[in-house]
């Protein structure tokens, strides 16, 4: 477009446009998707400016030829942003929640933590249950495994185990996801 600031530089992760295309020879495709052939970048820019549009680098062919399109770059970017927003709307975001327990947790405390985990699972969140070993408690790995199994039995009506319990440093971690209805 003519009203573009000539001193502005494109953002690094952005595709090259107009003068910022580095190739000397480019393959040009016009706004009607007609192949205009290989020509110099200067000629392609003149064609784009005569139509009051931008020269946009689409990609590079295996032989090294740069592929460009004559488009309204502002409109193209707007449509890309619109598509990405629409795609984001339709994504289901699963939130991760963590519940920490210890090997020698009391029965009532375990039930309270399980009730909280059920709430998280009903909201649709993924729950990470971390059993922390303190000091030399790591040698009682089977006791920790039993505690996690007891915890899972309390929440098994609303969740299913995604990953089995796995030792990670001083933590025994288990992941529970909501059951599909």
UniProtKB/Swiss-Prot annotation:
Keywords: Cytoplasm, Initiation factor, Protein biosynthesis. The keyword Protein biosynthesis applies. GO terms for cellular component: cytosol; membrane. It is found in: Cytoplasm. PROSITE patterns: IF3. One of its GO terms (biological process) is ribosome disassembly. It comes from the Bacteria. The keyword Cytoplasm applies. GO terms for molecular function: ribosome binding; translation initiation factor activity. Pfam families: IF3_C, IF3_N. Signal peptide: none annotated. Monomer. Belongs to the IF-3 family. IF-3 binds to the 30S ribosomal subunit and shifts the equilibrium between 70S ribosomes and their 50S and 30S subunits in favor of the free subunits, thus enhancing the availability of 30S subunits on which protein synthesis initiation begins. This is Translation initiation factor IF-3. It comes from Mycoplasma capricolum subsp. capricolum (strain California kid / ATCC 27343 / NCTC 10154). The lineage of its organism: Bacteria, Bacillati, Mycoplasmatota, Mollicutes, Mycoplasmataceae.
């Amino acid at each position: 477009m003519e009203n573009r600031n000539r001193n502005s530089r494109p953002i690094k992760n952005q595709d090259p446009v107009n003068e910022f295309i580095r190739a000397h020879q480019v393959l040009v495709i016009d706004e009607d998707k007609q192949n205009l052939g290989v020509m110099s970048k200067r000629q392609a820019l003149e064609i784009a400016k005569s139509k009051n549009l931008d020269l946009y680098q689409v990609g590079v062919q295996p032989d090294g030829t740069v592929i460009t399109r004559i488009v309204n770059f502002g409109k193209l970017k707007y449509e890309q942003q619109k598509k990405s927003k629409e795609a984001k709307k339709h994504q289901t975001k699963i939130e991760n929640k963590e519940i920490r327990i210890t090997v020698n947790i009391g029965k009532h405390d375990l039930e309270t933590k399980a009730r909280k985990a059920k709430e998280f699972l009903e909201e649709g969140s993924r729950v990470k249950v971390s059993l922390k070993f303190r000091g030399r408690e790591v040698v009682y790995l089977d006791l920790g495994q039993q505690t996690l199994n007891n915890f899972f039995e309390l929440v098994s009506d609303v969740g299913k185990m995604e990953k089995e319990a796995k030792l990670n440093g001083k933590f025994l971690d288990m992941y529970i996801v909501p059951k599909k209805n």
